C-alpha cells in the first residue's frame, strides 16, 4: 500500500517551477488587456487610501521594519473577495500587508479571466 502511495505521488504532475512569477505575468497581461486599466482605476479608487494606511500601520507596529521592495499577487473572485494572496520578498512589512490585504473585498472584477489576477509592486521611499 505504501509503495502505491509513493508511486502515485511521484507520478502526479508538479507545480510550475515558479508559480508566483507566472501569476505576476498573468496579472500584468490582464491589466494591459481590454478592461484592465478601467478595473485598476476602480480598484485603486476603492482601496488606495486603505492600502497606504495599512502599509503605514505595518511599518509603525514592527520593531525594525524591512522596507525592501516587494510584490503582492492575488486572485479576485467574482464577488470581490480575494484568494491566493502571496508576496515576494516575504519581509515583515510584506507579510503584514499581505495578512491585511487578504481580508479585504475589492470591486467586482471583469468576468474574464476568472479568477481575475492582480499584482502590486511596492517600493517604500523615505
Residue ranges and their predicted role:
Residues 2-11:
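Sec-dependent N-terminal signal peptides
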Amino acid at each position: 500500500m505504501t509503495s502505491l502511495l509513493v508511486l502515485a505521488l511521484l507520478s502526479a504532475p508538479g507545480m510550475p517551477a515558479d508559480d508566483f512569477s507566472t501569476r505576476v505575468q498573468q496579472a500584468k497581461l490582464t491589466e494591459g488587456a481590454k478592461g484592465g486599466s478601467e478595473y485598476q482605476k476602480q480598484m485603486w479608487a476603492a482601496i488606495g487610501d486603505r492600502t497606504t494606511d495599512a502599509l503605514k500601520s505595518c511599518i509603525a507596529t514592527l520593531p525594525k521594519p524591512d522596507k525592501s521592495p516587494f510584490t503582492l499577487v492575488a486572485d479576485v473572485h467574482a464577488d470581490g473577495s480575494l484568494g491566493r494572496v502571496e508576496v515576494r520578498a516575504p519581509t515583515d512589512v510584506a507579510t503584514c500587508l499581505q495578512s491585511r490585504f487578504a481580508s479585504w473585498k475589492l470591486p467586482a472584477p471583469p468576468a474574464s479571466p476568472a479568477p481575475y489576477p492582480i499584482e502590486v509592486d511596492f517600493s517604500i521611499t523615505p
